[in-house]
């Protein structure tokens, strides 16, 4: 089985192989997104409190993103290293990476659970919570935080299944959890009357099932690389390269948290709870664009990394071209949808007429440049697949830290409608970041391939 997977990666037709890995990865990303979207859809329609509760849950997003950031520090850093080691025929090294990564995820879970549980109320105030929305944010957040170990294991260990070529198994991890979440949400939120607490409990339970599924597979007979007890002890020489490569994804997600704080605090200042509520809806919708793109890149990563490790330059190039075409095509279709029917999309998340109206105009502004994001993510993630941690990190910082976050605070000073200025920062940064990232990638791509995997 292992030999067949390696043969497919190194010699099978590239496009069918990519689709075989990308489709389950995209489905997994979309299904994983349902954990939060389904919660928000149900919460937004709770009679009498829907808009306030939805806004409160949205304010918890920065903490949720930080949890995901620590998970992907390990998953996004370890999976490419594992694939490169496997491509070079070093199975023992690949299994050491998996074992060390698992231990680090458990360590992060303990530290983050203690810190975020104690600091949740103060942090949520800082993010822009009002007296009306804080109770819902705390109620949802503290339960979610208590289950963070399952969140980190699912997000952090699932890439190690995908990178071995078991994309369908990886997809089932999120499908199983999402189905359980969808079933439990209405029962706990409405049936038992638990409200936002019910949504959090449903999410934690579904993530726990997903974590058990992953551990069963990685310790079972079907996997190529096993999670072994003898490799759980952390070794500096093993974990530091993982952290070095994963820091790019960590920065991407942690700055996403900082970005969310910047948006929510600015909008709370200029527009109050309704503006923050609109941003909650817009953020959920925008993830329907960005996460499938990341799924495409996640599916392409094992093929690019393996063939880079094996020194097969032409196959790496073919994989990248196909990945870029899919990413740009998807973002173009998504952009057309957002420009055409933003009000219909907003109505899925809330029945509050005022919130729908506000979200409709805000969404058109925010999404105006999103078609360019496909180019930026495809290029930036390809740097990761090729082991180029420093360049990938710089590009991860570019859009959010260097461009978007400053623009959120600068642009409102140049327009009469301050909230318009806040939302306008997004498309401006999207277009600038995509242009710079594409130029950087295409000027370096051939040089990286010529150097080969030995210097990754």
Where are the model-predicted features located?
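Short runs within selected transmembrane alpha-helices of multi-pass transporters and secretion channels
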Residues: 75, 144-162, 170-178, 199-212, ...
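Residue-level signal for transmembrane alpha-helical positions in Major Facilitator Superfamily
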Residues: 19, 34-35, 74, 115-119, ...
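Helix-terminus/linker motif at the lipid-water interface of multi-pass membrane proteins
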Residues: 30, 34-55, 124-131, 187-194, ...
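Transmembrane helical elements of multi-pass membrane transporters/channels
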Residues: 20-39, 143, 177, 206-210, ...
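Interfacial/gating helices of multi-pass transporter permease domains
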Residues: 20, 43-65, 132-136, 196-197, ...
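Small-residue-rich hydrophobic transmembrane alpha-helices
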Residues: 54-114, 151-170, 264, 278-336, ...
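N-terminal transmembrane alpha-helices
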Residues: 9-49, 62-77, 81, 106-113, ...
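Short alpha-helical transmembrane segments in multi-pass integral membrane proteins
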Residues: 1-25, 82-149, 191-247, 304-369, ...
